Amino acid sequence: MKAARFAMHSARSLSSVGLVPREVELFSRYSPSPLSMKQLLDFGSDNACERTSFSFLRQELPVRLANILKEIDVLPDRLTNTSSVQLVKSWYIQSLMELVEFHEKSPEDQKNLSDFVDTLIKVRNRHHNVVPTMAQGILEYKDTCTVDPVTNQSLQYFLDRFYMNRISTRMLMNQHILIFSDSQTGNPSHIGSIDPKCDVVAVIQDAFESSKMLCDQYYLTSPELKLTQVNGKFPGQPIHIVYVPSHLHHMLFELFKNAMRATVERQESWPSLTPVEVIVVLGKEDLTIKISDRGGGVPLRITDRLFSYMYSTAPTPVMDNSRNAPLAGFGYGLPISRLYAKYFQGDLNLYSLSGYGTDAIIYLKALSSESVEKLPVFNKSAFKHYQMSSEADDWCIPSREPRNLSKEKMAM
């Protein structure tokens, strides 16, 4: 316990004065090693070897943490000096230092393996509030200084990479904990958090019902679901893929919430609500899910903002010291959902018809061998993204009143 308190104090002290341990410099020189869904399954198969997973993670997790710590250091000083970002940085440094302690420990010793699982659980719990805490840091920064378009673009670039890094480290830790922990709490048909035969339609229906319950509570009404499935790969059979059900549920739940809200608010005076229509199609390479509503859509000028962090129609939340910090109001629903889709080489896009409705489309890889982690790496190319300077726009900006060329000719 004393060692843990000392590590936490040291991490905060180093972070507060802008210093990082030499271990961060060391591990940031390595690039992360992306895993495919198939490789993750192999780690958790019947022949899974805890020692192999231990040996991989004690190297890989510090590499991923160190890479993103280096990226935090190139952010504007006023941002990195906020109390929230300092706190996040101290968590990452402490976690890295705790994981590095296992580098010299033998994987043949069962106690080391058990201690490693305990450490992963501790790290995962420590990072529980990373998303809202970093979001609070961005808000603190924006409250103290004006953010120009170039800086805003850099923040968007950083947050995409920071949260993708978090998704990936959490995925690796969860896999090891669920498979090798003494307390088996996962679904017995899953390998860790991965379902080898994920029933896509079942996840869609579950996410819809969860959203419907919220909609009923708030609006006292909700639209129905109209679902169509097309299995172009194996006609007539149910649609199954290798995937992480919790990731898919997260994406669908967010999209259904938006679709239901738009539908109810747009059609409150209509005799009945139009259904939210979903079509799910399995092809040879991709699984595609399209969610369509008639909620009125949004103008083109707003569409791009929907995937921008900090854009939200909900009131800005207030952080407290509880472990249940809110995310609603930070504007993170859609951008985080898109990251979940992109994590295994998929995507999430919105197509809106202003005055009619919106189509939201999720693309996922149909083959587990092609579902490979999409990971940020801090290198010269990434560094350049943060060194961009604000330059004059090279496109004409229309004036409110067109120039009167006839008067200019007379003046000449």
From Swiss-Prot:
One CC-aspect GO term: mitochondrial matrix
Top class in the EC scheme: transferase
UniProt keywords, alphabetically: ATP-binding, Hibernation, Kinase, Mitochondrion, Nucleotide-binding, Transferase, Transit peptide
Residues at the site labelled Interaction with the other subunit in the homodimer: 157, 161, 395
InterPro entries: AK/P_DHK_N_sf, BCDHK/PDK_N, BCKD/PDK, HATPase_C_sf, His_kinase_dom
Gene3D superfamilies referenced in this protein's UniProt entry, alphabetically: Alpha-ketoacid/pyruvate dehydrogenase kinase, N-terminal domain, Histidine kinase-like ATPase, C-terminal domain
Residue numbers binding ATP: 254-261, 293, 312-313, 329-334
A GO BP annotation: hibernation
Superkingdom to which the source organism belongs: Eukaryota
Induction notes from the record: Up-regulated during hibernation.
PROSITE patterns with a match to the protein in the record: HIS_KIN
Subcellular location: Mitochondrion matrix
Reaction equations catalysed: L-seryl-[pyruvate dehydrogenase E1 alpha subunit] + ATP = O-phospho-L-seryl-[pyruvate dehydrogenase E1 alpha subunit] + ADP + H(+)
Residue ranges constituting the Histidine kinase domain according to the UniProt record: 138-368
GO molecular function: ATP binding; pyruvate dehydrogenase (acetyl-transferring) kinase activity
Main location: mitochondrion
Tissue expression summary: Detected in skeletal muscle and heart.
The protein's role, per its UniProt record: Kinase that plays a key role in regulation of glucose and fatty acid metabolism and homeostasis via phosphorylation of the pyruvate dehydrogenase subunits PDHA1 and PDHA2. This inhibits pyruvate dehydrogenase activity, and thereby regulates metabolite flux through the tricarboxylic acid cycle, down-regulates aerobic respiration and inhibits the formation of acetyl-coenzyme A from pyruvate. Inhibition of pyruvate dehydrogenase decreases glucose utilization and increases fat metabolism in response to prolonged fasting and starvation.
Subunit record text: Homodimer. Interacts with the pyruvate dehydrogenase complex subunit DLAT, and is part of the multimeric pyruvate dehydrogenase complex that contains multiple copies of pyruvate dehydrogenase (E1), dihydrolipoamide acetyltransferase (DLAT, E2) and lipoamide dehydrogenase (DLD, E3).
Protein name: [Pyruvate dehydrogenase (acetyl-transferring)] kinase isozyme 4, mitochondrial
Organism: Ictidomys tridecemlineatus (Thirteen-lined ground squirrel)
